[in-house]
Amino acid sequence: MSTPEYLDEAAIRAILERQRAAALAHEPWSAEQRGERIDRAIDLLVRHERALIEAIGADFGQRSPTFSRHSDVLSPLATLKQTRAELAGWMQPEPRPVPRGQAWVEYQPLGVVGIVTAWNVPANMVFKGLAGALAAGNRVMLKPSEFNPQTSALIARMLAEAYAEDEVAVVNGPAEVGQAFCRQPFDHLLFTGAASIGRHVLRAAAENLVPVTLELGGKSPTIISRSADLASAVGRIIAGKLMNAGQLCVAPDYVFVPQESVDAFVEIARKVVSRLLPSLADNPEYTAILNQRHYQRLQGYLDEARGAGVELMELGAAGDALDPALRLIAPTLLRDPPDRLQVMQDEIFGPLLPIKPYRELDEVIGYINARPRPLGLYWFGSDPAEEQQILRRTCSGGVTLNEVMHHAALESLPFGGVGGSGMGAYHGIDGFRTFSHAKAVYRAG
Protein backbone atom coordinates (compact mmCIF):
# COMPACT_ATOMS: atom_id res chain seq x y z
CA MET A 1 0.00 0.00 0.00
CA SER A 2 1.40 3.39 -0.94
CA THR A 3 1.96 6.03 1.73
CA PRO A 4 -0.56 8.88 1.52
CA GLU A 5 0.82 12.22 0.44
CA TYR A 6 0.08 15.11 2.77
CA LEU A 7 0.28 18.83 2.24
CA ASP A 8 3.51 20.49 3.30
CA GLU A 9 3.66 23.84 5.05
CA ALA A 10 3.97 25.80 1.81
CA ALA A 11 0.86 24.15 0.38
CA ILE A 12 -1.09 24.84 3.57
CA ARG A 13 0.00 28.48 3.42
CA ALA A 14 -1.07 28.68 -0.22
CA ILE A 15 -4.62 27.60 0.67
CA LEU A 16 -4.76 30.22 3.40
CA GLU A 17 -3.58 32.94 1.03
CA ARG A 18 -6.18 31.93 -1.56
CA GLN A 19 -8.90 32.08 1.07
CA ARG A 20 -7.69 35.46 2.32
CA ALA A 21 -7.52 36.86 -1.21
CA ALA A 22 -11.06 35.65 -1.90
CA ALA A 23 -12.32 37.26 1.30
CA LEU A 24 -10.69 40.59 0.48
CA ALA A 25 -11.86 40.60 -3.14
CA HIS A 26 -15.54 40.89 -2.24
CA GLU A 27 -17.83 42.49 0.29
CA PRO A 28 -18.52 40.33 3.34
CA TRP A 29 -21.20 37.72 2.81
CA SER A 30 -24.74 38.87 3.56
CA ALA A 31 -26.98 37.04 6.03
CA GLU A 32 -28.59 35.26 3.09
CA GLN A 33 -25.23 34.16 1.68
CA ARG A 34 -24.03 32.93 5.07
CA GLY A 35 -27.29 31.08 5.59
CA GLU A 36 -26.94 29.39 2.22
CA ARG A 37 -23.47 28.13 3.17
CA ILE A 38 -24.80 26.82 6.46
CA ASP A 39 -27.59 25.08 4.53
CA ARG A 40 -24.92 23.20 2.59
CA ALA A 41 -23.48 21.83 5.83
CA ILE A 42 -26.96 20.79 6.96
CA ASP A 43 -27.48 18.96 3.68
CA LEU A 44 -24.13 17.16 4.05
CA LEU A 45 -25.00 15.81 7.50
CA VAL A 46 -28.42 14.64 6.35
CA ARG A 47 -27.11 12.89 3.23
CA HIS A 48 -24.05 11.34 4.86
CA GLU A 49 -25.51 10.31 8.22
CA ARG A 50 -25.04 6.57 7.72
CA ALA A 51 -21.55 6.95 6.25
CA LEU A 52 -20.44 9.13 9.18
CA ILE A 53 -21.73 6.68 11.77
CA GLU A 54 -19.98 3.79 10.00
CA ALA A 55 -16.69 5.68 9.61
CA ILE A 56 -16.61 6.73 13.27
CA GLY A 57 -17.42 3.17 14.30
CA ALA A 58 -14.58 1.86 12.14
CA ASP A 59 -12.10 4.30 13.68
CA PHE A 60 -13.10 3.33 17.23
CA GLY A 61 -13.32 -0.38 16.46
CA GLN A 62 -16.65 -0.36 18.28
CA ARG A 63 -18.72 2.73 18.99
CA SER A 64 -22.34 3.02 20.04
CA PRO A 65 -24.30 3.80 16.84
CA THR A 66 -26.96 5.47 18.96
CA PHE A 67 -24.41 7.78 20.55
CA SER A 68 -22.77 8.48 17.18
CA ARG A 69 -26.09 9.50 15.68
CA HIS A 70 -26.89 11.84 18.54
CA SER A 71 -23.42 13.31 19.08
CA ASP A 72 -22.07 13.52 15.54
CA VAL A 73 -25.19 14.01 13.42
CA LEU A 74 -28.24 15.25 15.34
CA SER A 75 -26.37 17.57 17.72
CA PRO A 76 -24.40 19.46 15.03
CA LEU A 77 -27.54 19.50 12.86
CA ALA A 78 -29.41 21.27 15.66
CA THR A 79 -26.53 23.74 16.01
CA LEU A 80 -26.47 24.53 12.31
CA LYS A 81 -30.24 24.99 12.15
CA GLN A 82 -30.32 27.26 15.20
CA THR A 83 -27.40 29.26 13.83
CA ARG A 84 -29.17 29.59 10.49
CA ALA A 85 -32.30 30.90 12.20
CA GLU A 86 -30.55 33.43 14.42
CA LEU A 87 -27.56 34.74 12.47
CA ALA A 88 -29.36 37.71 10.86
CA GLY A 89 -30.16 39.05 14.31
CA TRP A 90 -26.60 38.51 15.51
CA MET A 91 -25.28 40.53 12.57
CA GLN A 92 -27.23 43.69 13.42
CA PRO A 93 -25.21 46.72 14.56
CA GLU A 94 -25.47 47.37 18.30
CA PRO A 95 -26.22 51.01 19.22
CA ARG A 96 -24.22 52.39 22.15
CA PRO A 97 -25.21 55.45 24.20
CA VAL A 98 -23.13 58.62 23.69
CA PRO A 99 -23.71 62.25 24.81
CA ARG A 100 -23.92 63.45 21.21
CA GLY A 101 -23.62 62.00 17.73
CA GLN A 102 -24.10 58.27 17.15
CA ALA A 103 -22.10 55.23 18.20
CA TRP A 104 -22.47 51.56 17.46
CA VAL A 105 -20.63 48.26 17.18
CA GLU A 106 -20.47 46.40 13.88
CA TYR A 107 -19.54 42.73 13.77
CA GLN A 108 -17.11 42.17 10.92
CA PRO A 109 -15.71 38.85 9.62
CA LEU A 110 -12.16 38.22 10.80
CA GLY A 111 -11.10 36.63 7.51
CA VAL A 112 -9.72 33.09 7.67
CA VAL A 113 -10.42 30.91 10.72
CA GLY A 114 -8.40 27.77 11.45
CA ILE A 115 -10.10 24.94 13.35
CA VAL A 116 -8.25 21.96 14.85
CA THR A 117 -10.53 19.24 16.22
CA ALA A 118 -10.10 16.26 18.54
CA TRP A 119 -10.95 12.60 17.96
CA ASN A 120 -13.64 11.85 20.53
CA VAL A 121 -16.67 13.43 18.78
CA PRO A 122 -15.08 14.21 15.42
CA ALA A 123 -18.00 15.33 13.24
CA ASN A 124 -19.58 17.21 16.12
CA MET A 125 -16.57 19.47 16.56
CA VAL A 126 -16.03 20.03 12.84
CA PHE A 127 -19.60 21.10 12.13
CA LYS A 128 -20.17 23.07 15.34
CA GLY A 129 -16.98 25.04 14.74
CA LEU A 130 -17.97 25.50 11.12
CA ALA A 131 -21.38 26.85 12.16
CA GLY A 132 -19.94 29.72 14.18
CA ALA A 133 -17.18 30.58 11.73
CA LEU A 134 -19.51 30.63 8.70
CA ALA A 135 -22.17 32.59 10.60
CA ALA A 136 -19.55 35.26 11.23
CA GLY A 137 -18.80 35.37 7.49
CA ASN A 138 -15.35 33.77 7.54
CA ARG A 139 -13.48 31.41 5.27
CA VAL A 140 -12.48 28.25 7.14
CA MET A 141 -9.57 25.81 7.17
CA LEU A 142 -10.06 22.59 9.15
CA LYS A 143 -7.55 20.11 10.57
CA PRO A 144 -9.44 17.02 11.81
CA SER A 145 -7.72 14.56 14.13
CA GLU A 146 -5.29 12.08 12.63
CA PHE A 147 -6.60 9.49 15.13
CA ASN A 148 -9.85 9.18 13.12
CA PRO A 149 -8.38 8.51 9.66
CA GLN A 150 -11.57 7.15 8.08
CA THR A 151 -13.79 9.85 9.55
CA SER A 152 -11.35 12.63 8.68
CA ALA A 153 -11.06 11.41 5.09
CA LEU A 154 -14.85 11.22 4.78
CA ILE A 155 -15.28 14.74 6.18
CA ALA A 156 -12.73 16.04 3.66
CA ARG A 157 -14.68 14.44 0.80
CA MET A 158 -18.00 15.73 2.13
CA LEU A 159 -16.85 19.33 2.47
CA ALA A 160 -15.17 19.26 -0.94
CA GLU A 161 -18.59 18.38 -2.42
CA ALA A 162 -20.22 21.46 -0.97
CA TYR A 163 -17.60 24.21 -0.82
CA ALA A 164 -14.95 25.71 -3.03
CA GLU A 165 -11.47 25.47 -1.53
CA ASP A 166 -11.41 29.24 -1.00
CA GLU A 167 -14.53 28.90 1.20
CA VAL A 168 -13.86 25.80 3.30
CA ALA A 169 -10.79 23.57 3.07
CA VAL A 170 -9.72 20.45 4.96
CA VAL A 171 -6.09 19.62 5.70
CA ASN A 172 -5.57 16.02 6.81
CA GLY A 173 -2.41 14.34 8.00
CA PRO A 174 -0.29 13.25 10.97
CA ALA A 175 1.00 15.32 13.87
CA GLU A 176 3.62 17.17 11.83
CA VAL A 177 0.89 18.39 9.46
CA GLY A 178 -1.06 19.62 12.47
CA GLN A 179 2.01 21.46 13.71
CA ALA A 180 2.48 23.16 10.35
CA PHE A 181 -1.23 24.03 10.31
CA CYS A 182 -0.99 25.76 13.70
CA ARG A 183 1.96 27.85 12.53
CA GLN A 184 -0.16 29.62 9.91
CA PRO A 185 -1.12 33.31 10.26
CA PHE A 186 -4.84 32.73 10.67
CA ASP A 187 -7.15 35.50 11.78
CA HIS A 188 -8.34 33.19 14.57
CA LEU A 189 -7.50 29.64 15.62
CA LEU A 190 -9.86 27.29 17.49
CA PHE A 191 -8.13 24.26 19.02
CA THR A 192 -9.75 21.37 20.86
CA GLY A 193 -7.49 18.81 22.49
CA ALA A 194 -5.14 17.99 25.33
CA ALA A 195 -3.61 20.74 27.45
CA SER A 196 -0.11 19.45 26.68
CA ILE A 197 -0.72 20.02 22.95
CA GLY A 198 -2.59 23.26 23.61
CA ARG A 199 0.56 24.81 25.05
CA HIS A 200 2.42 24.11 21.80
CA VAL A 201 -0.50 25.48 19.76
CA LEU A 202 -0.48 28.69 21.79
CA ARG A 203 3.28 29.13 21.29
CA ALA A 204 2.97 28.56 17.55
CA ALA A 205 0.08 31.00 17.25
CA ALA A 206 1.97 33.63 19.24
CA GLU A 207 4.62 33.86 16.51
CA ASN A 208 1.97 35.41 14.24
CA LEU A 209 -0.08 37.08 17.02
CA VAL A 210 -3.01 34.83 16.13
CA PRO A 211 -5.86 35.03 18.66
CA VAL A 212 -6.69 31.57 19.95
CA THR A 213 -9.66 29.81 21.52
CA LEU A 214 -8.51 26.73 23.42
CA GLU A 215 -10.88 24.01 24.60
CA LEU A 216 -8.68 21.73 26.68
CA GLY A 217 -10.71 19.64 29.10
CA GLY A 218 -9.40 18.73 32.55
CA LYS A 219 -10.72 16.88 35.59
CA SER A 220 -14.38 17.90 35.90
CA PRO A 221 -15.56 17.27 39.48
CA THR A 222 -19.03 16.13 40.48
CA ILE A 223 -20.52 16.81 43.91
CA ILE A 224 -23.46 15.02 45.49
CA SER A 225 -24.94 17.10 48.29
CA ARG A 226 -26.61 15.56 51.32
CA SER A 227 -29.71 17.39 50.07
CA ALA A 228 -29.70 15.46 46.78
CA ASP A 229 -31.95 12.62 45.69
CA LEU A 230 -29.15 10.04 45.73
CA ALA A 231 -30.74 7.54 43.33
CA SER A 232 -31.48 10.23 40.75
CA ALA A 233 -28.01 11.75 41.09
CA VAL A 234 -26.18 8.44 40.71
CA GLY A 235 -28.31 7.46 37.73
CA ARG A 236 -27.52 10.67 35.90
CA ILE A 237 -23.81 10.63 36.76
CA ILE A 238 -23.33 7.03 35.65
CA ALA A 239 -25.36 7.52 32.46
CA GLY A 240 -23.20 10.53 31.63
CA LYS A 241 -19.98 8.66 32.39
CA LEU A 242 -21.01 5.78 30.13
CA MET A 243 -21.46 8.06 27.11
CA ASN A 244 -18.64 7.29 24.67
CA ALA A 245 -17.12 5.19 27.49
CA GLY A 246 -16.14 8.38 29.28
CA GLN A 247 -14.19 9.73 26.30
CA LEU A 248 -15.67 13.23 26.49
CA CYS A 249 -13.88 16.40 27.56
CA VAL A 250 -16.74 17.31 29.92
CA ALA A 251 -17.33 13.81 31.32
CA PRO A 252 -17.60 13.61 35.12
CA ASP A 253 -14.02 12.80 36.11
CA TYR A 254 -14.44 12.05 39.81
CA VAL A 255 -17.30 12.34 42.29
CA PHE A 256 -17.57 13.67 45.84
CA VAL A 257 -20.02 11.58 47.87
CA PRO A 258 -21.04 12.13 51.53
CA GLN A 259 -18.95 9.60 53.45
CA GLU A 260 -22.00 7.84 54.86
CA SER A 261 -23.49 7.38 51.36
CA VAL A 262 -20.57 5.74 49.53
CA ASP A 263 -21.85 2.17 49.87
CA ALA A 264 -25.30 3.23 48.68
CA PHE A 265 -23.71 5.06 45.73
CA VAL A 266 -21.90 1.87 44.69
CA GLU A 267 -25.02 -0.30 44.91
CA ILE A 268 -27.12 2.15 42.92
CA ALA A 269 -24.36 2.47 40.32
CA ARG A 270 -24.31 -1.33 39.89
CA LYS A 271 -28.04 -1.37 39.23
CA VAL A 272 -27.82 1.54 36.79
CA VAL A 273 -25.10 -0.12 34.70
CA SER A 274 -26.93 -3.47 34.74
CA ARG A 275 -30.06 -1.72 33.46
CA LEU A 276 -28.33 0.38 30.79
CA LEU A 277 -25.82 -2.28 29.69
CA PRO A 278 -27.09 -5.80 30.48
CA SER A 279 -23.91 -7.11 28.84
CA LEU A 280 -20.62 -5.57 27.79
CA ALA A 281 -18.71 -8.22 25.86
CA ASP A 282 -21.18 -8.54 22.98
CA ASN A 283 -22.95 -5.19 23.21
CA PRO A 284 -22.47 -2.89 20.18
CA GLU A 285 -23.84 -0.01 22.27
CA TYR A 286 -20.77 -0.06 24.54
CA THR A 287 -17.95 1.99 23.07
CA ALA A 288 -14.34 0.83 22.83
CA ILE A 289 -11.33 2.90 23.83
CA LEU A 290 -10.12 4.63 20.66
CA ASN A 291 -6.65 3.10 20.36
CA GLN A 292 -4.08 0.93 22.08
CA ARG A 293 -2.19 3.87 23.58
CA HIS A 294 -5.24 5.13 25.44
CA TYR A 295 -6.27 1.59 26.39
CA GLN A 296 -2.85 0.96 27.95
CA ARG A 297 -2.97 4.35 29.68
CA LEU A 298 -6.27 3.46 31.37
CA GLN A 299 -5.07 -0.04 32.26
CA GLY A 300 -2.02 1.63 33.79
CA TYR A 301 -4.25 3.71 36.07
CA LEU A 302 -6.03 0.55 37.20
CA ASP A 303 -2.78 -1.36 37.76
CA GLU A 304 -1.29 1.47 39.81
CA ALA A 305 -4.45 1.81 41.90
CA ARG A 306 -4.63 -1.95 42.47
CA GLY A 307 -0.99 -1.95 43.55
CA ALA A 308 -1.72 0.85 46.02
CA GLY A 309 -4.50 -1.20 47.63
CA VAL A 310 -7.39 0.83 46.23
CA GLU A 311 -10.71 -1.02 46.09
CA LEU A 312 -11.75 -1.34 42.43
CA MET A 313 -15.38 -2.16 41.66
CA GLU A 314 -16.20 -3.27 38.12
CA LEU A 315 -19.78 -2.59 37.10
CA GLY A 316 -21.67 -4.71 34.60
CA ALA A 317 -22.65 -8.31 34.04
CA ALA A 318 -20.80 -10.69 36.34
CA GLY A 319 -18.33 -12.86 34.49
CA ASP A 320 -18.42 -10.68 31.37
CA ALA A 321 -14.95 -11.42 29.99
CA LEU A 322 -13.73 -8.54 27.84
CA ASP A 323 -11.30 -9.27 25.02
CA PRO A 324 -8.30 -6.89 25.30
CA ALA A 325 -8.06 -6.91 21.50
CA LEU A 326 -11.42 -5.09 21.38
CA ARG A 327 -10.12 -2.39 23.79
CA LEU A 328 -13.23 -2.57 25.98
CA ILE A 329 -12.87 -1.56 29.63
CA ALA A 330 -15.66 -2.22 32.12
CA PRO A 331 -17.08 0.79 33.95
CA THR A 332 -15.06 0.83 37.17
CA LEU A 333 -15.45 2.69 40.46
CA LEU A 334 -12.32 3.44 42.52
CA ARG A 335 -12.95 3.98 46.23
CA ASP A 336 -11.00 6.97 47.56
CA PRO A 337 -7.75 6.62 45.57
CA PRO A 338 -4.83 8.64 46.99
CA ASP A 339 -4.22 11.94 45.21
CA ARG A 340 -0.67 10.87 44.32
CA LEU A 341 -1.97 8.25 41.87
CA GLN A 342 -2.05 9.16 38.17
CA VAL A 343 -5.79 8.53 38.00
CA MET A 344 -6.20 11.55 40.30
CA GLN A 345 -3.64 13.66 38.45
CA ASP A 346 -4.58 13.16 34.78
CA GLU A 347 -7.83 13.74 32.94
CA ILE A 348 -9.19 10.19 32.89
CA PHE A 349 -10.99 10.19 29.52
CA GLY A 350 -12.36 6.70 30.04
CA PRO A 351 -14.95 4.68 32.02
CA LEU A 352 -13.18 4.94 35.39
CA LEU A 353 -14.83 6.96 38.18
CA PRO A 354 -12.98 7.69 41.44
CA ILE A 355 -15.19 8.25 44.50
CA LYS A 356 -14.03 10.86 47.02
CA PRO A 357 -15.87 10.59 50.36
CA TYR A 358 -16.34 13.90 52.16
CA ARG A 359 -17.57 15.24 55.48
CA GLU A 360 -18.12 18.97 54.90
CA LEU A 361 -18.66 21.13 51.82
CA ASP A 362 -15.71 23.38 52.70
CA GLU A 363 -13.26 20.51 52.18
CA VAL A 364 -14.78 19.82 48.75
CA ILE A 365 -14.48 23.46 47.70
CA GLY A 366 -10.92 23.62 49.03
CA TYR A 367 -9.95 20.48 47.11
CA ILE A 368 -11.37 21.80 43.84
CA ASN A 369 -9.80 25.24 44.25
CA ALA A 370 -6.36 23.74 44.96
CA ARG A 371 -6.29 22.21 41.48
CA PRO A 372 -6.39 23.53 37.89
CA ARG A 373 -9.73 25.05 36.98
CA PRO A 374 -11.89 22.41 35.25
CA LEU A 375 -13.92 22.63 32.06
CA GLY A 376 -17.09 21.51 33.83
CA LEU A 377 -18.40 21.17 37.37
CA TYR A 378 -21.53 19.27 38.40
CA TRP A 379 -23.54 19.65 41.62
CA PHE A 380 -26.56 17.63 42.72
CA GLY A 381 -28.75 18.91 45.50
CA SER A 382 -31.74 20.98 46.60
CA ASP A 383 -30.15 23.32 49.15
CA PRO A 384 -30.15 26.86 47.63
CA ALA A 385 -27.48 28.14 50.02
CA GLU A 386 -25.14 25.27 49.17
CA GLU A 387 -25.79 25.75 45.46
CA GLN A 388 -24.74 29.39 45.78
CA GLN A 389 -21.60 28.38 47.68
CA ILE A 390 -20.61 26.14 44.78
CA LEU A 391 -21.34 28.77 42.14
CA ARG A 392 -19.60 31.63 43.97
CA ARG A 393 -16.59 29.90 45.49
CA THR A 394 -15.46 27.68 42.60
CA CYS A 395 -14.35 28.61 39.10
CA SER A 396 -14.88 26.35 36.09
CA GLY A 397 -15.62 26.72 32.40
CA GLY A 398 -19.28 25.91 33.02
CA VAL A 399 -21.60 24.34 35.57
CA THR A 400 -24.53 21.96 35.29
CA LEU A 401 -26.81 21.64 38.32
CA ASN A 402 -28.62 18.34 38.98
CA GLU A 403 -27.30 16.84 35.73
CA VAL A 404 -23.96 16.43 33.97
CA MET A 405 -22.58 18.00 30.79
CA HIS A 406 -25.78 19.78 29.73
CA HIS A 407 -24.22 23.26 29.80
CA ALA A 408 -21.85 22.15 27.02
CA ALA A 409 -24.69 20.95 24.79
CA LEU A 410 -26.74 24.15 24.81
CA GLU A 411 -26.17 26.57 21.94
CA SER A 412 -27.59 29.41 24.05
CA LEU A 413 -24.63 29.18 26.46
CA PRO A 414 -20.94 29.87 25.79
CA PHE A 415 -18.80 26.73 25.83
CA GLY A 416 -15.19 27.04 26.86
CA GLY A 417 -12.67 26.67 29.63
CA VAL A 418 -10.85 28.85 32.10
CA GLY A 419 -7.25 28.66 33.22
CA GLY A 420 -5.90 25.17 32.65
CA SER A 421 -9.08 24.01 30.89
CA GLY A 422 -8.84 26.60 28.13
CA MET A 423 -9.55 30.16 27.08
CA GLY A 424 -12.32 31.79 25.10
CA ALA A 425 -15.65 30.26 24.17
CA TYR A 426 -17.88 29.41 21.25
CA HIS A 427 -21.41 28.08 20.50
CA GLY A 428 -24.36 30.25 19.51
CA ILE A 429 -24.00 34.01 19.61
CA ASP A 430 -20.81 33.62 21.64
CA GLY A 431 -19.22 31.68 18.78
CA PHE A 432 -20.38 34.31 16.31
CA ARG A 433 -18.68 36.98 18.41
CA THR A 434 -15.53 34.91 18.92
CA PHE A 435 -15.13 34.64 15.14
CA SER A 436 -16.02 38.32 14.50
CA HIS A 437 -14.26 41.63 14.98
CA ALA A 438 -16.39 43.96 17.11
CA LYS A 439 -15.64 47.22 15.30
CA ALA A 440 -16.38 50.46 17.17
CA VAL A 441 -17.95 53.17 14.98
CA TYR A 442 -18.71 56.79 15.92
CA ARG A 443 -20.46 59.37 13.78
CA ALA A 444 -20.14 62.98 14.93
CA GLY A 445 -23.39 64.90 15.31
Name what the model sees in each region.
Residues 96-232, 358:
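Rossmann-like NAD(P) dinucleotide-binding subdomain of oxidoreductase/dehydrogenase enzymes
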Residues 1-104:
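N-terminal Rossmann-like NAD(P)+-binding subdomain of aldehyde/semialdehyde dehydrogenases
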